[in-house]
Amino acid sequence: MKTLADVFREALKEKGISSIGTLSKRFRKSKNKLQDIAIEIVHGKGAVFRVPEKTAVAWDLNGNRVDGSYYAYAPLCMREKFEPVLTPEELREKLPDWPYFIIDLYHWDKHTQKEKGKICLQVNQSYGLLRDYFTGSELAVTWANEEFREMFHGPLDRITTYGGPTSEFLKENGINEVVLLDPWAEEVLSEKDFDVKAFIIGGIVDTGGNKKKTTPKIGEELESAGIKVRRRKIVLRGDVVGVPDRINRILGIILKMMVEGKSMDEAVYEMQEPLHARWRLRKELPKRATRYMVEGKVYRVVEKELFDEYSKWLKIRWEDFVKVLRELDLVALERKRIHHLNKISNARIINGKLHRVILLKRAAMLCYNC
C-alpha cells in the first residue's frame, strides 16, 4: 500500500522534479522529509514553488541530502513571490482511498478520569503513527463528545471526529464492512483482511471490571445496524498473551503489516514493550522448568540460555528475565550445570508430576571422582 510520501514522490516526478528543499533550515527534523512536507501541503499549510536560487538544504526523492534545489516547500503566502508548481489541491486529488482507523468511544463514560486521559493520549499517539504513513485524517473517533474534545490536547482539526454512532459514520462514508480488532475473536488478522475500508481498533482501556469483554459488544451493535463485521485478533506465535493492548500500538502493528509488509510476529515485536514481553515470559518459562528435589525441597530450574532464545521474539532485557524468574520462584542455571544435575539425579513421579531427585551420596561420589 502506498504511503503519502510515495504519492508525493510520484507527483514530483510527473512535474520533472528530482529534488526538493525548504526555504527555512528550521523545518521539522525527521527521518522522512518527503512525508513531512507532504503532510503540510495536504493540510493546506504550503506548496511546492520554483525558486530563482538553489535552496541551502534539499533532498532527493529518496530522502537523501543533496546540495540544493530550485524547487522548495514554502508557506502559501509565498505565492505572490514564487511560481507554485504543486498546490494542496493538486496533491489531494492524487490521494488514494485509504481506510479509516476508528476508535469507538461508546463506552467513554465507563472510564475513570485517569483512564479517559489515557484514551486521549493514545488517540494522540495514534495520530502521530498515522501521519508517518498517510495524512492522519484517516484516524476517526466516533461518539466524540464535548468532554473528549476538551480533554484531547492533540490536533483535533487534523483527525476525523464524529459525535454519533460508528454505524452512522460508516454508512455516511459508504462503508458496509469492517474489521474489528478483538482479542476474543476466533480468527487471526491476515493480508486478506486489508481490503476493507475501515478498521475498528478500540476505545477501551483497562479491560477489567465493568469493561470486561466490551469489544465484542461493539461488533454486535454494528451487526444489528446492518454492518458486516470481521472479528479478528492479533497473536504472537499463536497466542494473544504478549500482544500490546494499547490502542496506538495495535494500530502500529496493523500499519507495519499493511504498509511495510511485515509478518505479524515481526510487527508485534517492533511495537512491543518490555511490560508486554514479561506477560508472555511468565507464561513460557514454567513450560521449560525442571523440578529438582533435594532433601525434600523442590527447586524449579530453567536454562539460563533461554534468555537468548526468548529475546529473539520477545523484547526483553536481562533485568526483565531476572524479574520474571523471581516472580515465578524459578532458578536459572547454565545448561552444562543442568546436565550435571541430571547425571546425579533419578526421575520420579511425585503427586502426578515429574521430579528429578538428587541423591546426595551419589552427588558426593561423582564430585569426588571429578
Curated annotation (Swiss-Prot):
Its main location: cytoplasm. Its EC number is 2.1.1.218, 2.1.1.221. One of its GO terms (molecular function) is tRNA (guanosine(9)-N1)-methyltransferase activity. It is found in: Cytoplasm. One of its GO terms (cellular component) is cytoplasm. Keywords: Cytoplasm, Methyltransferase, S-adenosyl-L-methionine, Transferase, tRNA processing. Residues 87-292 form the SAM-dependent MTase TRM10-type domain. It comes from the Archaea. InterPro entries: MT_TRM10-typ, MT_TRM10-typ_sf, tRNA_m1G_mtfrase_arc, tRNA_N1-methyltransferase. It catalyses: adenosine(9) in tRNA + S-adenosyl-L-methionine = N(1)-methyladenosine(9) in tRNA + S-adenosyl-L-homocysteine + H(+); guanosine(9) in tRNA + S-adenosyl-L-methionine = N(1)-methylguanosine(9) in tRNA + S-adenosyl-L-homocysteine + H(+). The keyword Kinase does not apply. GO terms for biological process: tRNA methylation; tRNA processing. NCBIfam families: Trm10AGmtase_Thcocales (NF041140). Belongs to the class IV-like SAM-binding methyltransferase superfamily. TRM10 family. Catalyzes the S-adenosyl-L-methionine-dependent formation of either N(1)-methyladenine or N(1)-methylguanine at position 9 (m1A9 or m1G9) in tRNA. This is tRNA (guanine(9)-/adenine(9)-N1)-methyltransferase.
